[in-house]
Amino acid sequence: MTKTIAINAGSSSLKWQLYLMPEEKVLAKGLIERIGLKDSISTVKFDGCSEQQILDIENHTQAVKILLDDLIRFDIIKAYDEITGVGHRVVAGGEYFKESTVVEGDVLEKVEELSLLAPLHNPANAAGVRAFKELLPDITSVVVFDTSFHTSMPEKAYRYPLPTKYYTENKVRKYGAHGTSHQFVAGEAAKLLGRPLEDLKLITCHIGNGGSITAVKAGKSVDTSMGFTPLGGIMMGTRTGDIDPAIIPYLMQYTEDFNTPEDISRVLNRESGLLGVSANSSDMRDIEAAVAEGNHEASLAYEMYVDRIQKYIGQYLAVLNGADAIVFTAGVGENAENFRRDVISGISWFGCDVDDEKNVFGVTGDISTEAAKIRVLVIPTDEELVIARDVERLKK
């Protein structure tokens, strides 16, 4: 038995989960928030307990030290060397990383170079890797990429209709994201349906504050909604998703909001989506509450959100020539029953239908009516478990 920790480092946060492997038992999990700010918050959950403390945490290395010391303080481990492997979520692997990889040689430098593809994510992911390397230099360290699952896409799906030189020289193509989640729920869907994954055609919908939809055939990604960066695809909590590119130069010319690349990134990534249209919130719970109160902007935002998701599902039904199941996962996909009902009701003529008695908050599994030809599944994602499994596989 070994202890492996899965890490998801953000620019000011560190989410973690400690596993006993190969039993895949969660020993503890936690979240450190507001790194680099005053009054940082560290939360540790274990054995049904939850402990929280307010600290000043200056950087990721200090955050990792606090995490490890808490594991000892709460008697979850006796010493640092009980942890034999650490896996790090990294958003962008580009064309260079086609699978999870042990951190050695120039791997970390390559991860940092690929920050051009995920400027909001890769630098923070790399900071987490460096912090653990500094404190636990001798354990196996693995990077697990959101993009790896999508490297199976055919060229017709990942290329953009731009001059070829922008692909060959600048690597402009679709990379996708959330691959670890899509891979996990596809495997769980096969178990739930009692059929080999290789025989299935699935549409997996990872819908959280960020969101993406993937067409999965025989266990492989054949197309996905996110593009060159996680900005593409469906409308999201604060991101536009797909828009006409000509909007950008138009707004640069006629408004004061788009003067620099940073301005463009800020508006499209952080001020748009549900938040931008509703002028209220990026959180689906707030949007649904505002809709119930008759708020027009919130209602429009919700309708646009559902509409974009329905269109991508329809598109991928065409790509796959039908589907065996549509899978909902992540924060909104797992918990917003009205949202699931509304998405499916608009595409019911494809042969999918939701049973209202099964489609309730907190329920997972098959929520379809008996007569539905395409099953509708709710499956909680577990990206941390996939990361831990990859660490164990690569340690061998």
Curated annotation (Swiss-Prot):
Compartment(s) where it occurs, according to its Swiss-Prot or TrEMBL record? Cytoplasm
Biochemical pathway: Metabolic intermediate biosynthesis; acetyl-CoA biosynthesis; acetyl-CoA from acetate: step 1/2
Recorded GO cellular component terms are:
cytoplasm
GO biological process per UniProt = acetate metabolic process; acetyl-CoA biosynthetic process
Q: Which reaction does it catalyse?
A: acetate + ATP = acetyl phosphate + ADP
Q: What is its main location?
A: cytoplasm
Arranged from A to Z, the UniProt key words for this protein are: ATP-binding, Cytoplasm, Kinase, Magnesium, Metal-binding, Nucleotide-binding, Transferase
- Name the source's superkingdom: Bacteria
List ligand-binding residues for substrate.
R89
Matching entries from InterPro entries are given as:
Ac/propionate_kinase, Aliphatic_acid_kin_short-chain, Aliphatic_acid_kinase_CS, ATPase_NBD
Which SUPFAM superfamilies does this one have? Actin-like ATPase domain (SSF53067)
Which HAMAP family would you find in this protein's record? Acetate_kinase
Q: Which family does the similarity line name?
A: Belongs to the acetokinase family.
What this chain does, per the record? Catalyzes the formation of acetyl phosphate from acetate and ATP. Can also catalyze the reverse reaction.
What protein is this chain from?
Acetate kinase
